[in-house]
């Protein structure tokens, strides 16, 4: 029987992590775990409940009362918060601009990481985020770090927003993505960085299929 491993895919906002991770998970019949969606789900709940996103204890208390479920479906992964389908709404501008502030709190990350590790027990998972290879799954058999230029990432996010029916301003997106990069890279707890043993792939001029093919080569080497 083929060994079921853990695959960690990290990188900055809009580097193509989720798209590629879903594709890899589908090809391997693995479970896809979008850790960013978990932080977005908590951020959505905080905004909904009027909880200060800079108040760590208030967020931790809210998280304790929040059920976050990731469910596969023919349309892709669905995200539920306390039974409510929030898959699309957590991709909106309000959540996008607030999520980095929520994700930088050490105690919030500690609880989220515990939940993420529990989901990965037994292997057979593809998990993407900012600190999977360095912090959440440091022993993952395959670690990938995706990067792309700010301009290309803004263009991708712009197209995603339009496809979802969200208003979108390309120049504003460039500024927001650069700002998120700074917050994610400079936070004290589990900052965005490439694991020493991760394979770095610049996706700026690559198609999703080309990136997926490269990752599958690495996975097959490790499984074999």
Curated annotation (Swiss-Prot):
**InterPro entries (UniProt xref):** Cytidylate_kin, Cytidylate_kinase_dom, P-loop_NTPase
Task: Give the first-level EC class, as a single word.
Answer: transferase
- Does the keyword ATP-binding belong to this entry? yes
GO molecular-function terms, A-Z: ATP binding; CMP kinase activity; dCMP kinase activity
Query: Could you name the domain of life of the organism this protein comes from?
Result: Bacteria
Please give the GO cellular component terms listed in this UniProt entry: cytosol
Would I find Glycoprotein among this entry's keywords?
A: no
Q: Which GO terms describe its biological process?
A: nucleobase-containing small molecule interconversion; pyrimidine nucleotide metabolic process
- Catalytic activity line of the entry: CMP + ATP = CDP + ADP; dCMP + ATP = dCDP + ADP
Q: Which UniProt keywords apply?
A: ATP-binding, Cytoplasm, Kinase, Nucleotide-binding, Transferase
Enzyme Commission no: 2.7.4.25
Q: Where in the cell is it found?
A: Cytoplasm
A Pfam family in this protein?
Cytidylate_kin
Sites where the protein binds ATP: 11-19
Question: Which family does the UniProt entry place this protein in?
Answer: Belongs to the cytidylate kinase family. Type 1 subfamily.
Which PANTHER family does the UniProt record give?
CYTIDYLATE KINASE (PTHR21299:SF2), CYTIDYLATE KINASE/PANTOATE-BETA-ALANINE LIGASE (PTHR21299)
User: What name goes with this protein?
Assistant: Cytidylate kinase
Report the source organism: Geobacillus thermodenitrificans (strain NG80-2)
